[in-house]
Regions:
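Catalytic donor nucleotide-activated moiety binding site of glycosyltransferases and closely related
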Residues: 45-59, 205-240
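A donor-sugar binding/catalytic signature common to diverse glycosyltransferases
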Residues: 87-98, 108, 249-286
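A conserved, positively charged/aromatic
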Residues: 107-108, 119-131, 250
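A nucleotide-sugar donor-handling region in carbohydrate enzymes
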Residues: 130-197
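Catalytic binding pocket for nucleotide-activated donors in carbohydrate/polymer assembly enzymes
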Residues: 269-309
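Conserved donor-nucleotide binding/catalytic region of nucleotide-linked donor-dependent transferases
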Residues: 307-323, 342
């Protein structure tokens, strides 16, 4: 059997790694992506074999459309030649359209019903959709997929991505001293579901001024974004691009301040004290807050106070809670294997 996996984000790459680990010996797997800085860098770090076709459309709607059409055109020939029996994606619009056009079974994972444009473009064309149990099927069925084709798994996606092996000898951006490491992740700016102005600038300024004696590292996403941050914050803190493995960074972090996305979920399940400034409100972040694995705070002063409390407490509560939650989760890839065999 031949399987095609289309990978568009770093999280999808890490998730796919575990799929390949379980299916790679048995099946012929082709992995594609688009030219997108964070994915290509992570693929290098992880030594992950990817074929890059097309590019990321950026933040503008017209350029997104052009990039998607261009990618579909280039990729459809490649896929026709490869002739897969099954397509796996994370709701890739190009994979949805190509698999529909070529009559190939398409199985997708998704935990982002808030990504309205992507849901509308993909869900009506997908055969089976796998979702975390904490999200209601109705959140997806409203976009045109029948509820009977939605399969829930008792886990969130971070349970898969934190399983990855990492190189613990790799270089890190933190200084080697006895100070606390504070890692701040800047929010996504170019996704179709992002429209609000940045929340992170006042948070960075406050944390940098309050904790100047600690190791504060800001993790950016795009070159332009990093340049803008450097102009605003200056040389008061280290601003880096994502040329590190997130798990390795988190293992060496005392407090993580995230936007509520993938790294926030990974940090929480790893038992790292985690604060979310909730850049894009979503159901997974909500679940983690309810389970007391994440503190949600948007006010820079209150975030600063939370960090102080975490440093003063210095207990293992986060790790204990995370261990309990992890033990209650199942492996979503086993559900995928079952569907492939059907």
């Amino acid at each position: 059997m031949k399987i095609w996996i289309d990978i568009l984000t770093p999280k999808q790459l890490l998730f796919s790694e575990q799929i390949i680990e379980k299916l790679g010996k048995k099946y012929d797997i082709l992995c594609t992506s688009r030219d997108y800085n964070e994915v290509s860098k992570l693929a290098k770090i992880r030594n992950f074999d990817l074929i890059f076709i097309g590019k990321h459309g950026g933040g503008d709607e017209k350029s997104k459309l052009k990039a998607s059409i261009d990618r579909m055109e280039k990729m459809s020939e490649k896929i026709k030649t490869f002739s897969p029996d099954v397509v796996i994606s994370f709701c890739s619009p190009e994979a949805a359209r190509i698999s529909f056009g070529l009559g190939i079974k398409h199985i997708a994972f998704c935990d982002s019903p808030h990504a309205n444009a992507v849901m509308r473009l993909t869900l009506p064309l997908i055969e089976k959709l796998l979702i975390p149990h904490v999200i209601s099927k109705k959140e997806f069925s409203k976009y045109g997929i029948d509820e009977k084709n939605i399969i829930q798994y008792k886990a969130i996606d971070a349970i898969i991505t934190i399983k990855r092996r990492i190189n613990r000898n790799a270089k890190l951006p933190f200084k080697k001293n006895n100070k606390k490491n504070i890692l701040i992740r800047v929010e996504e700016e170019q996704a179709s579901y992002t429209s609000k102005p940045s929340k992170i600038i006042p948070i960075i300024k406050k944390v940098v001024s309050e904790f100047e004696k600690e190791n504060v590292v800001v993790l950016g996403r795009y070159v332009e974004q990093i340049k803008n941050l450097q102009k605003i914050v200056g040389n008061k803190t280290k601003i880096v691009k994502m040329s590190y493995d997130g798990k390795h960074l988190l293992e060496n972090t005392d407090v993580f301040v995230g936007s509520g996305g993938t790294m926030t979920a990974e940090s929480a399940l790893m038992g790292i004290p985690t604060i979310s400034y909730n850049a894009v409100p979503n159901i997974i972040e909500n679940f983690l807050v309810k389970k007391h694995l994440v503190k949600r705070e948007t006010d820079p002063n209150k975030i600063s106070m939370q960090i102080k409390r975490i440093f003063e407490a210095d207990d293992k509560q986060s790790q204990k809670r995370a261990k309990i939650i992890r033990s209650q989760m199942e492996d979503p890839i086993q559900k995928l294997i079952k569907i492939i065999k059907e």
